[in-house]
Amino acid sequence: MREILGNKKGIRDSVLNELIALYDVQVPLGQLISAELALKLADITEFINREISLYISRSGQITNIVIGGNDSVELPAVEGRRGIGRLSGIRCVHTHPNGNPVLSGVDFSALKNNKFDAMVTIGVTAPDYTQSIISFGMIVGLDKEEQFICDESVSYTHLRA
């Protein structure tokens, strides 16, 4: 079902319709997120001053869109069954309206608990969104206690459509 979850209070219908239209966007294989989609998310994030989260499947299909507050977003549970050491097949892409691209402790917890393929943040820098910085974390293995080990990478590449 194509719906927007989360904190929709005070959000214009035109903005909600822009977000619903994102369900039609296909992220190319081999990309965490396309530059065009990242720029669109940055634009909407700046306009509403709230975090936005997308779930994207391995095939590039957007499966969930959630609006949060200005410093957090509630993430829905990832559907499907998987083994104890298997990832979900979903990457979570979300925005930080304050421009900080660094993954928070909450982001790393969500990465581990939901077994995301990746947790991606876009530190939105306005008014020139091409200056926004993207970082991402991934589960890179298991430790001796079979707990997930995460690693973060920050991309200083500027967004260009």
Where does each model-flagged region fall?
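Acidic, Ser/Thr-rich peripheral helices and adjacent loops at domain boundaries
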Residues: 141-153
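Conserved small/polar residues in nucleotide/adenosyl-binding loops
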Residues: 157-161
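Short, basic/aromatic recognition patches
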Residues: 38-42
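A short catalytic or substrate-binding loop motif that flags glycine-/basic-rich loops and adjacent residues
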Residues: 45-49
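Short beta-alpha junction loops
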Residues: 97, 122-129
